[in-house]
């Protein structure tokens, strides 16, 4: 069951769902808007001949901070990581689905490649997988709305929510755009 605006506000007001900073105007009929932070991870294309998910490639990306009032320019075909301005704390009985904003999608901005699902128990900032499918560069401004998070009530709380020690939750507690930790799946 997807939470309605009323259910989202109730979950936040009761402390069941954590969102910080929380802006009540971001609550939509069946989702909550999410904003872009000022940090991006850009790929260092000249450092490697290819990306190898089995290897830890520490300098594959570099962190870039956009100064106040400036924009990050995402070029056609470019792929970077960004993150939400908001920090989330999902309880064991709520899961989330990140989607892009329709108005930005119509300009060619994709907010995630494959990782749009947010597990119950997740705590941290959500990483965006941003790409520009248009033929022109797109200006991305810190604090602009770039996505929406729909929340789903599960049939029962997860027995082992994300962040439980046995799961090896690689991205629990992440702050800012977090580079891939796919190499940990090969250990």
Swiss-Prot record:
Pfam families noted in UniProt: DCD (PF22769)
InterPro entries in alphabetical order: dCTP_deaminase, dUTPase-like_sf, dUTPase_trimeric
Marked site (Important for bifunctional activity) residue numbers: 116-117
Catalysed reaction equations from the record: dCTP + 2 H2O = dUMP + NH4(+) + diphosphate
EC class of the enzyme, as a word: hydrolase
SUPFAM superfamilies (alphabetical): dUTPase-like
SS bond list: none
Protein residues bound to dCTP: 101-106, 119, 148, 162, 174
Recorded superkingdom: Bacteria
Gene symbol of the encoding locus: dcd
Subunit structure: Homotrimer.
Free-text function comment from the UniProt entry: Bifunctional enzyme that catalyzes both the deamination of dCTP to dUTP and the hydrolysis of dUTP to dUMP without releasing the toxic dUTP intermediate.
GO molecular function: dCTP deaminase (dUMP-forming) activity; dCTP deaminase activity; nucleotide binding
Keywords from the named record: Hydrolase, Nucleotide metabolism, Nucleotide-binding
GO biological process: dUMP biosynthetic process; dUTP biosynthetic process; nucleobase-containing small molecule interconversion
CDD domains: trimeric_dUTPase
Name of the protein in question: dCTP deaminase, dUMP-forming
Pathway assigned in UniProt: Pyrimidine metabolism; dUMP biosynthesis; dUMP from dCTP: step 1/1
Enzyme Commission number, as recorded: 3.5.4.30
Family assignment from sequence similarity: Belongs to the dCTP deaminase family.
Active site as annotated: 129 (proton donor/acceptor)
